[in-house]
Amino acid sequence: MDHHHHIASRNSSTTSELPSFEPACHNGNGNGWIYDPNQVRYDQSSDQRLSKLTDLVGKHWSIAPPNNPDMNHNLHHHFDHDHSQNDDISMYRQALEVKNEEDLCYNNGSSGGGSLFHDPIESSRSFLDIRLSRPLTDINPSFKPCFKALNVSEFNKKEHQTASLAAVRLGTTNAGKKKRCEEISDEVSKKAKCSEGSTLSPEKELPKAKLRDKITTLQQIVSPFGKTDTASVLQEAITYINFYQEQVKLLSTPYMKNSSMKDPWGGWDREDHNKRGPKHLDLRSRGLCLVPISYTPIAYRDNSATDYWNPTYRGSLYR
């Protein structure tokens, strides 16, 4: 009973201190609505207890309530000073000791009053630790922002690899194009050379063929003593040409009045004349007679017949 009387006295003191609120309108008859502070009822014991504990938190504790036995002892002593030493107060104090930590955790962030939500001690302490010492993003890991650091070196490496692959592909394509162009140019040049060779080869080989044919013909005509080598054939051809030149000179001398040339055979006859006596020097003495072709018989002018007027080859050497 003493305990209940003490709580009632405290309720009367706290309600007397509350400010009075004037009504918005007043009824003149005196029976209208009048604000009565006594009608507002609170849990005065809990409100007063929370306000005292809040003052203790503001004076002695900084952020979170530590597990300090001295502070708990002071708190118990404070309540023992206000209440009596009967069994009801001891039971109330034990309940207060159990709930003091969660009440203090609640009142530390509040201004006193309002609704009171009792949470377990472990959850209230972990909530304060998270709220006061850890960042807000750690409360709910699902909402934690995840930023992946951009590795510039790997990005540059990948970009360099892609650029190198593109350059290699471009180089291979350019090399293939160059090879094709070179092959086409080589084929065109080879075809041009073949066509030029085919056009120029007959002209180059024609003189050689003619010279070969001439040498073969000369070998067939002139074959001195069965010799067919080129040196012997050419030497015999030179001798043959010199003989015909002498014959032309000899036969053309009588028709050339101003000619001082003499017949080489006449020189031989002169020597014989000096030895044996004078002789008449003419062509008839040598068995030669020059007459115009118009006076010769027609039979002798036939090409198929033998020309008796022409001297035989090497006829003068074998006389």
UniProtKB/Swiss-Prot annotation:
| GO (cellular component) term, any one | nucleus
Keywords, comma-separated and alphabetical: DNA-binding, Nucleus, Transcription, Transcription regulation
Which InterPro entries does this entry report, sorted A to Z? Answer: bHLH95_bHLH (IPR045239), bHLH_dom (IPR011598), HLH_DNA-bd_sf (IPR036638), IND-like (IPR045843)
Alphabetized GO MF terms: DNA-binding transcription factor activity, RNA polymerase II-specific; protein dimerization activity; RNA polymerase II cis-regulatory region sequence-specific DNA binding
CDD domains recorded: bHLH_AtbHLH_like
Q: What SUPFAM superfamilies does the entry give? A: HLH, helix-loop-helix DNA-binding domain
Location comes to: Nucleus
| Ranges where the bHLH domain occurs | 195-244
Keyword Transcription attributed: yes
Q: Which GO terms describe its biological process?
A: regulation of transcription by RNA polymerase II
Q: Which Gene3D superfamilies match?
A: Helix-loop-helix DNA-binding domain
Recorded superkingdom: Eukaryota
| Assembly mode | Homodimer.
This protein is called what?
Transcription factor bHLH111
